[in-house]
């Protein structure tokens, strides 16, 4: 399994010389796995990084794109109207995301692509989109099989399948499950309903978790610990340093470097990649937040882990 970052900036895109190392596109990640069907690409979020990602997918001849949405703030959706694949009607685009206030993926796309905000109404391109609302985060599991593609199961059916190896009512065997990419979900601490995704590549045992747009908490809830536990790579929101957060950013729904380090240590994650870099942060400030994470680990009994902390950068590829 491998991940490529196409957008690691939070809140708004930036473009200035002082951000050239980590980049300025807003959130978009691509996941590579042998569990994906041939000709299929798996993405997380559709910030401005979706535009270069879509260009790469077009060059590869990708025929189906699965996009998992964490939530619908502008910095996670602004790539949709400008991505080439929005207009390629011979490519299927499947969008999965939470539903809140009556708004799921379809309603979000209808809203951001309509007059007077955008010249192309979503109805004109919707025929090759498939929109799926995830209404029970924590009670659903996505399973992607290389031959059968994605399906969403209830947690009880998924656990029954794991325990008994019976196809039952879900139409999937235990053997097929072990050939699949399993994606679990957890609700983050953020002003709107936001989803963290855990990716488990069953054939290799590799695990990655993306925890973006998540606020610091005094303690780690058991559900969150279990969601992250044993991850080979944790990509986590570390938008602020501690002084910024305490001065004026608490309650914004984002985290700090020292908190991300604590999550890494307490859940046993092997590596930690910071993401959702603040738009005001130059490269040296992003690196300073990494240093803050490393210092926390050294001061709290995990010095060996300090060197496994880094900041994600646009166009970076990470083997898991």
Put a short name on every predicted segment:
Residues 1-206, 283-320:
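Binuclear metal-dependent hydrolase catalytic cores
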Residues 200-209, 214-313:
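Cap/insert and terminal regions of metallo-dependent hydrolase folds
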């Amino acid at each position: 399994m491998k991940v490529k970052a196409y957008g690691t900036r939070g809140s708004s895109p930036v473009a200035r010389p002082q951000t050239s190392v980590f980049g300025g596109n807003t959130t978009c990640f691509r996941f590579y796995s042998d569990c994906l069907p041939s000709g299929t690409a798996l993405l997380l979020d559709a910030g401005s990084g979706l535009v270069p990602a879509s260009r790469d997918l077009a060059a590869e001849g990708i025929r189906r794109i699965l996009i998992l949405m964490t939530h619908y703030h502008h910095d996670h959706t602004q790539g949709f109207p400008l991505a080439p694949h929005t207009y390629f009607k011979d490519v299927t685009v499947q969008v999965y995301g939470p539903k809140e206030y009556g708004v799921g993926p379809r309603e979000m796309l209808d809203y951001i692509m309509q007059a007077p905000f955008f010249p192309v109404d979503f109805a004109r391109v919707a025929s090759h989109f498939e929109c799926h609302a995830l209404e029970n985060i924590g009670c659903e599991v996505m399973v992607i099989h290389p031959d059968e593609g994605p399906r969403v199961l209830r947690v009880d059916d998924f656990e029954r399948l794991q325990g008994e190896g019976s196809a039952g009512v879900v139409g999937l065997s235990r053997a097929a499950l072990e050939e699949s990419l399993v994606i679990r979900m957890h609700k983050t601490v953020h002003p709107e309903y936001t989803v963290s995704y855990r990716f488990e590549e069953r054939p290799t045992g590799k695990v990655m978790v993306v925890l973006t747009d998540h606020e610091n908490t005094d303690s780690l809830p058991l559900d969150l610990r279990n969601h992250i536990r044993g991850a080979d790579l944790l990509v986590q929101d570390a938008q602020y340093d501690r002084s910024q957060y305490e001065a004026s950013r608490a309650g914004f729904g984002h985290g700090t470097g020292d908190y991300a380090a604590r999550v890494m240590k307490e859940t046993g994650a092997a590596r930690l990649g910071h993401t959702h870099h603040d738009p005001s942060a130059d490269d040296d400030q992003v690196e300073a937040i990494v240093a803050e994470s490393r210092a926390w680990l050294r001061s709290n009994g995990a010095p060996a882990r300090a060197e496994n902390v880094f900041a994600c950068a646009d166009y970076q590829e990470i083997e898991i």
